[in-house]
Amino acid sequence: SGLYEARLGKTEFGGETHVFSAAYRLDEFDEILNYADHIVFNTPGQVLKYGEKVKKAGKQAGLRLNPECSTQEGHAIYDPCAPGSRMGTTLPMLSEAGNFEETILPYLNGFHMHTLCEQNSDDLETTLRAAEENFGAWFSKVKWLNLGGGHHITREDYDRERLIRLVRGLREKYGVEVYLEPGEAVVLNAGFLVTSVLETMENGMQIAILDTSAACHMPDVLEMPYRPPLIGAGDAGEKPYTFRLGGPTCLSGDCI
């Protein structure tokens, strides 16, 4: 998502480094070009601002698309297709940019979409239908399509055969290379967060103070918000005891 992640990717992980940012800082862009192989832009304006630099550096440029097709329920904060989203270029935005094929497309090697979050391949299929309807006329004019992350490929109920069919279909229909970002699936259920109860108290409810923090160790719990699974636990009132779990920090809302 910018200079520091690009540097980390290139220096620590190696291989092909892709970077995306909703907008790039001018004073950082030349250094980003030293690390990134693919630079994905969020808007046509960013392509026009930096596209020539990317081309001269011998790197590849992409444009993030917003197919305006929400497949998530109840998690607008993680939905790039939510109304008012700043993530990606919509079809009306392309129309407003003028002659796309003459002014923007010559700088592009690919298109990028990231619309999923912990989802199955049926939602990817729904997204692709919308993306092809809006932008499919240009897919065969680029080298690659990056379908982003959010694919829960390692989940037991994930339909991998459908995913294979979709990827093969894109390659055959448009002659493009297809990227999938690894995302959470590569480490799904690979470990546990272990915590201990330091103290218990009561203030209108039973509260357990832990030696771990939602804000510090699991920020998605507060930002999304969501309730992470706890081994042996149940819903409120289901078990003999019901406790709220809180962290040791001074943040009042640091609760799981």
Which residue stretches match the model-derived regions?
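A structural signal for short, well-ordered beta-strand segments and their strand-loop junctions
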Residues: 62, 146, 178-180
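Glycine-rich beta-strand-to-loop/alpha-helix junction loops that act as flexible
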Residues: 115-116, 145-154, 182-185
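Short, acidic Gly/Pro/Ser/Thr-rich loop/turn segments
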Residues: 68-70, 118, 152, 215-217, ...
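Active-site-proximal beta-alpha core segment in soluble small-molecule metabolic enzymes
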Residues: 1-144, 156-158, 166-169
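Gly/Ser/Thr-rich helix-start
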Residues: 89, 111, 149-151, 184, ...
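Charged (often Lys/Glu-rich) extended helix/loop segments that serve as interaction or gating elements
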Residues: 166, 177-256
